[in-house]
Structure formats: C-alpha cells, structure tokens
Amino acid sequence: MTLKQRYDAVLGYFRDNVPVAESELHFDSPYQLLVATMLSAQCTDKRVNLTTPALFSAYPTPEALAAASEEDVLALIRSISYPNSKARHLVGMAQKLLSDFGGQVPSEVDALMTLPGVGRKTANVVASITWGEPVIAVDTHVFRVSRRLGLSRGTTPRAVELDLERHVPADLRPIAHHWLILHGRYVCTAQRPHCNDCPLTAWCRDFAERGK
C-alpha cells in the first residue's frame, strides 16, 4: 500500500462515517477556547471542563483576566496540571492580548505563538477551530495515531504536523485534527489499543507489522 492509498483510505473512512467531529472542550468564544486549550496541556478535557465555568464566570473577558492576580487565578485552577505556571501564563496572555491585539484573539498561528504559554499546538487548535485555518494541531493522540497508522514516521510533533499537512487536503485539515484526536482518545489508546474494535486495521501499518 502506498502512502497516498493509506491517506485516501483513512480520510475516506472518516469522511464517510464521522461527518461531524468537534472539540470536547466547552467554550463560547475565541477567548474561552484559547483559555481552555492552554489549560488542557497535559490535562484531560473532562478536568478542564469542570474547571472553566468558575474561571469564565470570574474572568469573562480578556480585560478581566488581565487585571487579575496570579494568586486569584491559581485558586480557581488548582485541580489542573501545572496550575502555577498556567495561572501565570493566563494572566500574561490576557495582558498581551490587550497590549498587542486590542483584546481580540488573533487568527494567525505566528501571532498566537507570541502570547505567553501558547505553543504551536495550542496556536494551531485555536486557529483551526476559531478561524478555520488549514492547520493540524499535533497533540499526543494525533502523534500516536499518525505514527501507528503509518501516516507519518516523524519523531517530533512538528515533523508529524508537516507530514499531515503535506498529504491532508486543506479543506479537511480542521476536521482531520478532531478525527485523529477522538480516534486516539477512544480507540487507538496509548495503552492496550482497541484494535479488535478499530475500523482502520486494514490500512494500519502498526497492526500489519504486529501481525507478521
């Protein structure tokens, strides 16, 4: 099977069988998505969703968050992984949104990455979901699934991202990000992947190699 055939088969399956795939984070605005995505680093979406209602109630706008103390923000996100650094980054992010972007979440990945605490993955998530930018955010699930399926042999998230963007049509990239995340979260799990329940085994390089 050629690489193109594998991509065509995997994307074709998802397109035909999973026409709707969305983020499991809860948010109502680009600002809320940015905050939630920053909190989700090395933390589950479920835990983030339990935390953000109180945070968004206390700080409903970038202006409110920019004026907050790190200690007050920390008190609301203690159940999140790395709460101290995330509290510092959230306040710094909001302050830079005000000073550099008029309080508006920018659409460009490079601009988003100038915000404290915003790396390439977070920037790609926000640019893709909020603005429909043709980018693919590579988190641990996307990285794992892409390598197992044989969509990439990249050894870094950036290398996998470049492989995916080289082969996934631009109009499919925003939803392809969700396809791969959800597949990794519920089927192609890190420990004990559910291969017997996986509809992609016919095209999966890892499954084929383990079956030899």
What are these regions (language model features)?
Residues 2-212:
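Catalytic cores of DNA base-excision repair glycosylases
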